[in-house]
Design a protein with these regions (language model features):
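Active-site-flanking beta-strand signature of metal-NTP-handling nucleotidyl enzymes
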Residues: 3-8
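Short, surface-exposed ligand-recognition loops at beta-strand->loop->(often short) alpha-helix junctions
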Residues: 9-20
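An amphipathic, aromatic/His-enriched active-site/gating alpha helix that lines ligand/cofactor pockets
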Residues: 27-36, 55-90
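Glycine-rich beta-strand-turn "strand-cap" elements at beta-sheet edges
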Residues: 39-48, 76-103
Length: 103
């Protein structure tokens, strides 16, 4: 599994519209082959900043399958207008993992 990480700085005052548009865009990405799930988190200290975490089967599932696929143009038209600046997207693989144990 690969984790896509993107910090999304949204134009202040556009957060509600962004979240609505993301709800629609989520349907596009979730139908993409190799998509495993996503989480969109809103920053508590900077309310116009979001952290997008997307789980993919591989980097290529994101960079080729989704970004070069038929849904990406619609994804872009829904979301890219909200970003200032445009986000840097990076991919991560697990180096170490732990979770809380239940007693």
């Amino acid at each position: 599994m690969i984790l896509e990480h993107a910090v999304l700085d949204v134009v202040p005052g556009q957060e509600t519209d962004f979240e609505w548009a993301f709800g629609e865009a989520r349907e596009l990405i979730s139908a993409s082959p190799g998509f495993l799930g996503l989480e969109l988190l809103r920053c508590l200290e900077t309310p116009s900043r979001y952290l997008l975490l997307v789980r993919w089967e591989s980097v290529e599932a994101h960079t080729v399958g989704f970004r070069q696929g038929p849904s990406y143009e619609r994804w872009s038209s829904l979301l890219h207008r909200f970003y200032s600046p445009f986000p840097v997207v990076e991919h991560y693989a697990s180096a170490l993992s732990t979770s809380a144990s239940v007693v």
